[in-house]
């Protein structure tokens, strides 16, 4: 998958976007840039994708940091499940994940590859600094500018 492939398919409206946990948290808790990027990602002609690790991580973080917001998170997830594709994280490691410093983030990249996503939507500095070009790693603000 090259940048030219992505650009051509983006023009045709065929863009698969894996939404990382940090974007989901910000989308649930506010209505700023991450929320607007989430809405764009789940809106046709895009296909939004979550992996099972994102959902588990989201639930753990809300239980630990935002227990009073768990009902809002659960409601958000119920609505999200109607608009996204949920994928499992493959067990088989891929060579590209060595470029991700945080070992805990590597399964997210694995899921992105398995789901053949065009964009990984994240605010995670490890992904943003990785130098990966496939999938394209974008912040919510960058994604909104497309």
Task: Give the location of each predicted region.
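PIN/NYN-family metal-dependent endoribonuclease catalytic core
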Residues: 19, 31, 35-65
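Acidic, PIN/NYN-like endoribonuclease modules and their adjacent C-terminal/linker elements
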Residues: 1-4, 114-121, 125-146
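Hydrophobic/aromatic ligand-binding patch that stacks against planar heteroaromatic rings
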Residues: 40, 111, 129
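Domain-scale selection of a single, long terminal region
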Residues: 56-92
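Active-site neighborhoods of divalent-metal-dependent phosphate/nucleic-acid chemistry enzymes
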Residues: 83-120, 125
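Alpha-helix capping/helix-boundary segments
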Residues: 23-24, 54, 126-127
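Metal-dependent nucleic-acid phosphoesterase active-site entry motif
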Residues: 1-32
């Amino acid at each position: 998958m090259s940048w030219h492939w992505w650009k051509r398919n983006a023009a045709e409206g065929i863009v698969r976007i894996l939404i990382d946990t940090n974007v989901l948290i910000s989308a649930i808790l506010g209505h700023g840039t991450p929320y607007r990027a989430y809405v764009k990602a789940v809106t046709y002609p895009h296909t939004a994708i979550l992996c099972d690790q994102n959902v588990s991580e989201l639930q753990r973080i809300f239980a630990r940091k935002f227990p009073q917001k768990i009902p809002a998170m659960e409601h958000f997830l119920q609505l999200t499940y109607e608009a996204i594709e949920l994928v499992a994280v493959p067990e088989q490691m891929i060579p590209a994940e060595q470029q991700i410093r945080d070992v805990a983030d590597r399964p997210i990249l694995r899921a992105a590859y398995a789901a053949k996503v065009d964009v990984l939507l994240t605010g995670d500095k490890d992904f943003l600094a990785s130098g990966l070009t496939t999938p394209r790693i974008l912040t919510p603000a960058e994604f909104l500018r497309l």
